[in-house]
């Protein structure tokens, strides 16, 4: 996961300016298990959608009856029932919460159409963000690990490519 350019990506809004520093190229494929939209505050302007994506056994329909997924203010939650063929460590290593920063309007529109259990492929960059919003300094950093948990373990994902089932958006 390396990125050949140190060129920052700038996003400007009426009340803020944000600089994203690319850290790594990133690709994730799986099924979307939960989606949450945001519109208020500075983070909702930059990253209007969070997608929880799962792969491996978690993407198999026969396991849906054992696991439920949800999201709340930038956090991803799951519960599994007794008899589940997967355990806590498997869920952690086979799912992720992605804070989506659409590269353009077409990507944003595509992300909004993703439905639960859609098979998706997303490509782009993991970024750290710094900026100002309404005169306040803000920062937001991505995770670069697939094994971390808790606060700071989500991917801050600048998305440049979306495939939903067989449809491609760039």
What are these language model-derived features?
Residues 1-170:
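OB-fold and OB-like single-stranded nucleic-acid-recognition modules
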């Amino acid at each position: 996961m390396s990125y050949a350019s140190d060129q920052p990506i700038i996003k400007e809004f009426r009340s803020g300016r944000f600089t994203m520093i690319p850290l790594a190229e990133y690709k994730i494929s799986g099924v979307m298990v939960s989606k949450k939209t945001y519109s208020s505050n500075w983070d909702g302007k930059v990253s209007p959608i969070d997608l929880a994506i799962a792969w491996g056994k978690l993407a198999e329909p026969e396991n849906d009856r054992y696991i439920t997924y949800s999201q709340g203010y930038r956090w991803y939650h799951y519960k599994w029932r007794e008899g589940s063929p997967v355990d806590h460590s498997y869920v952690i290593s086979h799912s992720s919460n992605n804070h989506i920063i659409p590269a353009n309007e077409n990507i944003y529109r595509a992300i909004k159409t993703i439905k639960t259990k859609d098979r998706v492929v997303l490509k782009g960059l993991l970024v750290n963000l710094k900026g100002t919003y309404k005169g306040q300094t803000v920062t937001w950093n991505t995770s670069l690990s697939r094994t971390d948990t808790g606060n700071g373990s989500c991917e801050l994902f600048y998305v440049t490519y979306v495939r939903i089932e067989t449809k491609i958006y760039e």
